[in-house]
Amino acid sequence: MKAQVLTLTGSVAHEIELPPVFSSEFRPDLIKKAVIAQQSRRYQPHGAYVYAGITASAVGWGSGRGVSHVPRLKNSSRAAKVPQAKGGREAHPPKVEKVLIRNINQKEKRKALNSAIAATISPELVRSRGHVFTGSLPYVLSGDFESLKKTKEVIAALRAVGVYGDVERAERSRKVRAGRGKLRGRRYKQRKSLLIVTGKERLRAARNLAGVDVCLVDNLNVELLAPGTHSARLTLWTEDAVRKLGGEQ
């Protein structure tokens, strides 16, 4: 399988042979399993205070009064301590000893990564994820792209190859998050757009574009290729990155 290598102006420079990994079987089940396993490494243990809800001075009345046998506050008939009482303990509070990490076999993880890479060259899968682009997949840019230093130069190159519309889609998607999260440092939600995979230089000029992630091919992982377990992210490869995927140095 071959792909066209594009210049910064969008013209075809030459063709390159794609590595066999781009022909891997599509396995959304393994991709989801691998992403969840990776996300679980960031979970933090949570636990309730041991004496929460049970510090009240309350005793049961015993039988013979025609009321339930729950602990009641002294000099009062108000129930306390039990889960169904106001201010009582929680029935099943979070435990710090709960195992949060989800593991995955190494072979499954490797196969999931290969499958996620292969999904990036399927126009049907990429469009079904909501991405906007013109032209054919995969997008492979010449090595000059990695040397860009200005964001406006990166934007011009993305416009030339026909993928900047997806960045604009991510810009329009920004909205205030519902719920308490907006008070906890995550006020806005925004869709993911382009993933740029480079071979040698991490393209810092693209880091402020809406929804764009940049990574070296050596650091590529399943979650970058399938955010939220949804595979087939619109991905832009540099020529050096493709050669490294094929085992070339």
Curated annotation (Swiss-Prot):
One of the primary rRNA binding proteins, this protein initially binds near the 5'-end of the 23S rRNA. It is important during the early stages of 50S assembly. It makes multiple contacts with different domains of the 23S rRNA in the assembled 50S subunit and ribosome. PROSITE patterns: RIBOSOMAL_L1E. GO terms for molecular function: rRNA binding; structural constituent of ribosome. The keyword Protein biosynthesis does not apply. Belongs to the universal ribosomal protein uL4 family. The keyword RNA-binding applies. GO terms for cellular component: ribonucleoprotein complex; ribosome. Part of the 50S ribosomal subunit. Disulfide bonds: none annotated. InterPro entries: Ribosomal_uL4 (IPR002136), Ribosomal_uL4_dom_sf (IPR023574), Ribosomal_uL4_euk/arc_CS (IPR013000), Ribosomal_uL4_euk/arch (IPR045240), Ribosomall_uL4-arc (IPR019970). Keywords: Ribonucleoprotein, Ribosomal protein, RNA-binding, rRNA-binding. The gene is rpl4. One of its GO terms (biological process) is translation. This is Large ribosomal subunit protein uL4.
